[in-house]
């Protein structure tokens, strides 16, 4: 617990600072924008690339016998730094943004959702291919007490291939030997299209409500608070899971099959819903089916809570399934 304390103390400080700046703004109508900023930050912790990056780094450091407790925190700080810097810069361009807000909302909203949806579908399909390969290795290893060297190398190759940005920045992970080394990689992840669109949204929200600079600064701080909390919890969860998973080679591959399968489901599910909502809105489609109507009006800010629960349920489910069905393979 002592090893986690500095990171969670920093997270508490971010929450306190964000709330203090928010209340100093003294504008009740600004609270909705602040809540949105916090949820946008929390949402990022469940992105396929965030999960893959933190997971791969923790696995790498754990295998090397090094401290991996701060991976999730430093990654989120790198990503959040982009948001904080760009929000401050955006404050000086508010006049231009106000003038072009109608155009940005019309074009940016549609294009942003389409790009995000297609991006998630591509990620989901790529990870689905990796999942199938992992399942093949798992089936082959049923009769063995341990995985062969070739199988271990193939597993490592597959696991480090998850996530699109993760693939692009893969060479940089060779330089990560301490938790804080992930900070610049998190910064590079923060330069993505979705983060840029969210920065614009935060800046425009501040401008529309005519909040002070102090109030505007509360948004990226709350964004960082939400992201750092869930990224750090993700890291803690992954570290605990790997402590269990690395005790035997079969547990290791079984655990990664469970996590990869869940990542595939989330990416495809969210990607399809985003595309469905854009198409149905632009074509003015009306549905009688209750499920389709629910999907059409689904709020993604609420989805983050469901994903947290889904990850916990999936891990517990896979753990008990292992105990019931596969633990005999270790004997």
UniProtKB/Swiss-Prot annotation:
GO biological process, one term: nickel cation import across plasma membrane
Cytoplasmic topological domain residue ranges: 1-5, 55-66, 136-178, 247-252, 323-331
TM spans (from-to): 6-26, 34-54, 67-87, 114-135, 179-199, 226-246, 253-273, 303-322
Coiled coil residues, start to end: none
Membrane topology label: Multi-pass membrane protein
Keyword tags: Cell inner membrane, Cell membrane, Membrane, Nickel, Transmembrane, Transmembrane helix, Transport
GO molecular function, one term: high-affinity nickel cation transmembrane transporter activity
Membrane topology, Periplasmic segments: 27-33, 88-113, 200-225, 274-302
Principal cellular location given in the protein's record: membrane
Gene Ontology annotations for the cellular component aspect, listed alphabetically: plasma membrane
Pfam families (alphabetical): NicO (PF03824)
Cellular compartment(s): Cell inner membrane
InterPro entries: Ni/Co_transpt, Ni/Co_transpt_high_affinity
PANTHER family hit by this protein: HIGH-AFFINITY NICKEL TRANSPORT PROTEIN NIC1
Family per similarity comment: Belongs to the NiCoT transporter (TC 2.A.52) family.
Protein purpose: High-affinity nickel intake protein. Imports nickel ions in an energy-dependent fashion. Necessary for the expression of catalytically active urease.
Protein name, as recorded: High-affinity nickel-transport protein NixA
Encoding gene, per UniProt annotation: nixA
């Amino acid at each position: 617990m002592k090893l986690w304390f500095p990171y969670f103390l920093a997270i508490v400080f971010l929450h306190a600072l964000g709330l203090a700046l928010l209340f100093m703004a003294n504008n009740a109508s600004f609270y909705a924008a602040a809540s949105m900023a916090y949820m946008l930050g929390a949402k990022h912790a469940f992105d396929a690339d965030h999960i893959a990056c933190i997971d791969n780094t923790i696995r790498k450091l754990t295998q090397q016998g090094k401290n991996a407790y701060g991976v999730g925190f430093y990654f989120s700080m790198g990503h959040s730094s982009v948001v904080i810097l760009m929000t401050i810069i955006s404050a000086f361009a508010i006049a231009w943004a106000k003038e072009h807000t109608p155009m940005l909302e019309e074009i940016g909203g549609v294009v942003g959702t389409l790009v995000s949806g297609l991006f998630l579908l591509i990620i989901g399909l790529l990870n689905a291919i990796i999942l199938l390969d992992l399942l093949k290795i798992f089936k082959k290893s049923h009769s063995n007490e341990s995985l062969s060297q070739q199988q271990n190398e193939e597993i490592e190759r597959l696991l480090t291939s998850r996530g699109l940005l993760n693939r692009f920045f893969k060479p940089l992970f060779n330089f990560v030997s301490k938790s804080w080394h992930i900070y610049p990689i998190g910064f590079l992840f923060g330069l993505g299209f979705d983060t840029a669109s969210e920065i614009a949204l935060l800046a425009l929200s501040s401008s529309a409500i005519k909040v002070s600079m102090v109030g505007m600064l509360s948004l990226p701080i709350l964004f960082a608070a939400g992201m750092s909390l869930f990224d750090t919890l993700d890291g803690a969860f992954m570290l605990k899971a790997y402590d269990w998973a690395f005790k035997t080679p079969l547990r290791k591959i079984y655990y990664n099959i469970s996590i990869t399968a869940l990542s595939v489901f989330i990416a495809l599910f969210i990607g399809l819903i985003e595309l469905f909502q854009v198409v149905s809105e632009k074509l003015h489609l009306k549905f009688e089916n209750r499920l389709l109507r629910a999907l059409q009006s689904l709020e993604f800010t609420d989805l983050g809570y469901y994903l947290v629960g889904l990850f916990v349920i999936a891990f517990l489910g896979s753990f008990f399934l292992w105990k019931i069905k596969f633990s005999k393979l270790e004997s």
